[in-house]
Amino acid sequence: MKYVIILGDGMADEPIPSLNGKTPLQAADTPTFDYMAPRSRMGMLKTVPEGFHPGSEVANMSVLGYDLPTTFEGRGSLEAASIGVDIERGEMAMRCNLICVENGKIKNHSAGHISDEEAAELIAFLSEKLGSDTVRFYPGISYRHLLKIRGGDKRIDCTPPHDVPGTPFREVLVNADVPEAEETADLINDLILKSQVLLANHPVNKKRIAEGKDPANSIWPWSPGYRPSMPTLAERFGIKSGVVISAVDLIRGIGVYAGLKPVAVEGATGLWNTNYEGKAKAAIEAMKNNDFVFVHVEASDEAGHEGDVALKTRTIEYLDQRLCKPIVEAADRMQESVRIAVLPDHPTPCRLKTHTSNPVPFMIYSKGENADGISEYNECSAINGSLGTLETDGFIKELLK
């Protein structure tokens, strides 16, 4: 048996008036999901344990069945693994967004989805001006970068910028949870303020403003953590070989710690215009020689953060017709059985423009296996699935059993 997870980040939503009370998943034209649904077992998955923030790092680790209270160490350390940055003892890693601040308020978490090339130039500039033996910046993709602090204390309260669009940034600066962490909080806040001065008149931002684009005029570090201790899927379930396919450093980093080999796909952007066909082709190729394939698509999440209902619906259709369809067709042709799961990691409702902790719908498809006979796959239908509501490692064990 081979196993494939197709994860549409943030794909789940809530009923939307402009869609006649349907969710984007219900409203989208999804012939592949419609084919899979009556041939699948369904259920709901609680991906955000009590006490955890509904971030993609938490939710994707939950999908893979990790025990969050014992393994979670923040987003930064996971993303570091993806870009080959080692987190040593005594070092703290953080996600470091490039964001847009306008009139003292956070306009968006992505600096208008700044390009990789522009972002790399800005991160190199900040590294030159603000870097030291204590502070290191590392470039990632688009607005997503890495900050490493030697001697940093993770006991700080950091606000994810995508949770607070329109909020005065000074209201959500870093706070220490314990007195011992005040030095770390002060250091990070100082870096934020200094970055704003340095970036205000940088040529990259002057050019972006002239083109009518949002400037990347501030950094925003968040999700601190140390090096995680995560057993691999091979150690936990005997998976002999597997790959992770994603445009997002976070997901590739989770894959690295899970023992999965990252596969790069040209044109994978993390946005609606990602290379769906390229990802499908990479997954089909990986299925030939691997037991486990994890395909992650970010597009629906970004559309949800923008509150763009039409775009989110379209990204679900692209996922269905341009990625799922060729993978399912290839799986059905293989001599060896293939079990395919489709699910989001968390909802990103367009109304809220941020993540929620609500359980997400999943279906597990395999040609010739017992099925629930439910005609559609969405947030409402999956509630009636035979697998009920799962949590912790319930989903991954059900997939791999």
Label the predicted regions.
Residues 1-401:
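Feature captures the catalytic ectodomains and active-site-proximal regions of enzymes
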